[in-house]
Regions:
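Alpha-helical transmembrane segments of multipass membrane proteins
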Residues: 85, 89, 187, 191, ...
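Cytosol/matrix-facing amphipathic helices and coiled-coil assembly/linker segments
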Residues: 2, 9-45, 98-180
Length: 268
């Protein structure tokens, strides 16, 4: 995927590359910048965080089963149940959250249009106060207020952003939920690969949890490294952070499983 000007500028900043940064801020480069996200770039955040949650929660689940020394069949059942139930729950939560936010912004936009229509002077004064607090005074302030209030659409959007702190993107709640679900399931399936295909190879069957740890660690690092597309952190730092968080979660789950087996003598 071709990097945008903003992504190149972010990388130049991280590398301390002043010359590249200067070139990216030339009038020609700024003029070529598309001011709307490409369709495939809108849902990167959901995909990355869905994958992160999927692999961590699933691996923690089977680690708990391994710590309790339960059968591989139990691990597979628990892992798959956790994978699809948590994935669906997360996707539904994502959908409801985004839809609620969009509905709220829509209602606030309608209210602001109504106020601009019925109380224009009061709303104009609010715009003036907003920018006065930002340090503008005199003719510059008056000119800016006149420019903003000359368009009702711009006027209302400014009130939404500056007064209410509301910003709306053009992502689809349904698409966002689907991206979250499938990224969760795909990444979350990786810790279960050795359990699913254990019957095919004897070596895999004998070392399924150890091999699952290796596969999961590699996948966690990759998912963490990809996070830099969203957070801007160094790829190796993102990978190590993800590996640490996932490892700690799995270690705690394994310990709890072992502790319960020791206390209650669970055997399955």
């Amino acid at each position: 995927m071709r990097k945008t000007r903003v992504e190149k500028a972010r990388q130049a900043f991280l590398n301390g590359d002043l010359e590249t940064h200067r070139n990216l801020h030339s009038p020609e480069e700024i003029g070529k910048e598309p001011w709307h996200k490409a369709e495939q770039g809108k849902y990167i955040g959901q995909a990355v965080y869905g994958a992160s949650d999927g692999i961590v929660t699933t691996f923690a689940a089977i680690s708990g089963v391994a710590g309790a020394n339960l059968s591989p069949t139990v691990a597979l059942i628990v892992g798959l149940a956790n994978l699809f139930a948590d994935g669906l729950s997360m996707a539904i939560g994502d959908y409801l959250s985004e839809k609620s936010e969009k509905d709220y912004i829509k209602a606030e936009r309608e209210r602001e249009f109504w106020e601009v229509e019925h109380f224009p002077e009061a709303e104009k004064l609010e715009i003036k106060e907003i920018y006065k607090r930002k340090g503008l005074r005199g003719e510059k302030l008056d000119a800016l207020v006149d420019a903003i209030t000359s368009s009702k659409d711009l006027w209302v959007e400014t009130m939404l952003h500056e007064e209410l702190g509301l910003f709306e993107d053009d992502t689809s709640p349904l698409k966002s939920a689907l991206v979250t679900f499938f990224s969760f399931v795909i990444a979350g399936f990786m810790p279960l690969v050795t359990y699913v295909f254990a019957s095919t190879w004897t070596f895999v069957a004998e070392h399924r949890f150890a091999l699952s740890c290796v596969i999961t660690a590699v996948t966690m690092f990759i998912v963490g490294a990809v996070r830099q597309a969203v957070t801007g952190v160094k790829w190796y730092k993102g990978g190590m952070e993800m590996l640490f968080v996932g490892g700690m979660s799995a270690a705690v789950a394994y310990f709890i499983g072992w502790l319960l087996r020791t206390i209650f003598g669970i055997v399955m």
